[in-house]
Curated annotation (Swiss-Prot):
<keyword id="KW-1003">Cell membrane</keyword>
<comment type="similarity">
    <text>Belongs to the AzlD/HI_1737/HP1330 family.</text>
</comment>
<protein>
    <recommendedName>
        <fullName>Uncharacterized protein HP_1330</fullName>
    </recommendedName>
</protein>
<feature type="transmembrane region" description="Helical">
    <location>
        <begin position="43"/>
        <end position="63"/>
    </location>
</feature>
<keyword id="KW-0472">Membrane</keyword>
<feature type="transmembrane region" description="Helical">
    <location>
        <begin position="6"/>
        <end position="26"/>
    </location>
</feature>
<feature type="transmembrane region" description="Helical">
    <location>
        <begin position="84"/>
        <end position="104"/>
    </location>
</feature>
<dbReference type="InterPro" id="IPR008407">
    <property type="entry name" value="Brnchd-chn_aa_trnsp_AzlD"/>
</dbReference>
<keyword id="KW-0812">Transmembrane</keyword>
<keyword id="KW-1133">Transmembrane helix</keyword>
<keyword id="KW-0813">Transport</keyword>
<dbReference type="Pfam" id="PF05437">
    <property type="entry name" value="AzlD"/>
</dbReference>
<dbReference type="GO" id="GO:0005886">
    <property type="term" value="C:plasma membrane"/>
</dbReference>
């Protein structure tokens, strides 16, 4: 059983490593990315933010507590961070972490909606 778990972890590590290193092996100084790949690099950052916003708001029930307060807080943090820093990675990562912490801890629900 232990050997099986170790093999699974090893396969996951190698797969993750390969998917991370693959673009650098394919696109290098001798073989630069074409215009379409460069376009995807610019456009996908906005697409990822849009996808995260849709995922965030998909289960909101506006008419019952907590009225989407966790989602709205995370969404406003995306807007605020991106307007201030204009760094996509920061605008995606920190609000995602904030959203996950708020949803799993129920901190805002406890603060505003518990009697």
């Amino acid at each position: 059983m232990l050997m099986h778990s170790i093999l699974i972890i090893l396969v996951i590590i190698l797969t993750t490593y390969f998917t991370r290193i693959w673009p650098f092996m394919v696109f290098n100084a001798k073989n630069p990315p074409n215009d379409f790949v460069r376009y995807l690099g610019r456009a996908l950052s906005c697409s990822v933010i849009g996808m995260l916003v849709i995922y965030c708001f998909k289960d909101i029930h506006i008419l019952k507590p907590p009225y989407g307060i966790n989602e709205i807080t995370a969404f406003l943090s995306v807007i605020l961070l991106h307007r201030i820093f204009k760094v996509f990675v920061l605008s995606i990562t920190l609000p995602t972490i904030l959203y996950m912490v708020l949803v799993q801890s129920h901190a805002l629900e406890k603060a505003f909606f518990n009697p």
